[in-house]
């Protein structure tokens, strides 16, 4: 079975969609563990589905390197085929990215390369663009700079608020993430081809 470790920082709505998909015997992957950088609400989803969890708060470590080492060890302990950043709001340390190169994907609420970073929805509204969307991309050492795997566009309705737009994008992200993971697990999408 194709195995996943997911990393989160918040409520875990994308994680929940992935866990629900993996709960089906027809889905070709399983979430082996969920890690967080804080006591995130999304950990409850993992516990509900009987998935093991770990929390590693960077502030509780004497150095970033020590945190990075334990994060990498905690991920590798579960021997995942894929690491999914499902709302993980921290830049992965370069040592982690290098050790897991070609095996980490992220979901981002914009059409990258437009609006990278933590405030993509706010930035899209401030820029006055008519279209935004969601991107699944391979993680590299930059911030939202890795090769794009899949993008889905969303027209921005006039007068929409930031929370409303974020909610629309989240619905697209859930479906997009579940489908991309399915394609990777089934071998229909080869991540190594994106790193060439």
For each feature predicted by the language model, list its residue ranges.
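Conserved acidic residues
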Residues: 32, 81, 102
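N-terminal glycine-rich "phosphate-gripper" loop used for MgATP/nucleotide binding
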Residues: 36, 60, 64, 78-94
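Donor/substrate-binding cores of folate-linked one-carbon enzymes
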Residues: 21, 86-195
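Short beta->alpha connector loops at strand-helix junctions that form conserved
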Residues: 54-59, 107
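N-terminal Rossmann-like dinucleotide-binding module
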Residues: 1-41
């Amino acid at each position: 079975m194709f195995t996943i470790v997911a990393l989160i920082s918040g409520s875990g709505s994308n994680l929940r969609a992935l866990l629900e998909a993996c709960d089906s015997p027809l889905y070709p992957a399983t979430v082996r563990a969920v890690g967080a950088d804080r006591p995130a609400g999304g950990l409850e989803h993992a516990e509900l589905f009987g998935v093991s969890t770990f929390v590693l708060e960077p502030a509780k470590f004497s150095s970033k390197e020590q945190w990075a080492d334990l994060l990498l060890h905690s991920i590798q302990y579960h021997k995942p085929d894929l690491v999914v950043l499902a709302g993980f709001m921290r830049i992965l340390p370069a040592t982690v990215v290098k050790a897991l190169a070609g095996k980490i994907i992220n979901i981002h609420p914009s059409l990258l390369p437009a609006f990278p970073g933590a405030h993509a929805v706010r930035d899209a509204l401030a820029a006055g663009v008519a279209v935004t969307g969601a991107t699944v991309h391979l993680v590299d050492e930059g911030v939202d700079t890795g090769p794009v795997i899949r993008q889905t566009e969303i027209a921005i309705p006039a007068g929409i608020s930031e929370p409303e737009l974020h909610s629309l994008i989240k619905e697209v992200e859930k479906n997009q993430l579940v489908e991309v993971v399915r394609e990777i697990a089934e071998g229909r999408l080869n991540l190594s081809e994106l790193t060439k």
